[in-house]
A protein has these predicted regions:
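Ribonuclease/tRNase effector modules and their secretory precursors
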Residues: 1-111
Length: 111
């Protein structure tokens, strides 16, 4: 994917996040798993300081993207989000695994 395609959604993500962040039930369940415990502050850091690593323009929930950033302790965190007119939908958040991701957790490994 070209960088232009991925960077196209970032300004919309940031603008929507300024208005409101809405955590979908799935995101809250994933964030609160005992082996993850991802805080809303960590999600905010990923959105504000992270990078778009995958873009999903055809997502049935609306155009969304996968962002990589680092949480409060420096651990890598992935956040899938979708900008809407009045808010940013947080679809899920998780700690990426080395088996599934390479290049600093920014490139999905081929199966």
């Amino acid at each position: 994917m070209e960088m232009d395609e991925k960077s196209d959604i970032l300004p919309r993500v940031l603008e929507a996040a300024k208005k409101r962040r809405l955590y979908l039930p799935h995101a809250l369940r994933q964030m609160n798993r005992p082996n993850r415990m991802i805080s809303t502050g960590e999600v905010r850091l990923v959105i504000e300081d992270g990078e778009v690593i995958e873009d999903y323009p055809e997502d049935v929930r609306g155009h969304s993207c996968l962002m990589l950033g680092h949480g409060e302790s420096g651990r890598p965190v992935h956040v899938v989000c979708a900008p809407k007119n009045d808010y940013l939908a947080i679809i899920t958040a998780y700690i990426p695994g080395e088996k599934e991701w390479s290049d600093g957790f920014s490139v999905r490994r081929k199966p």
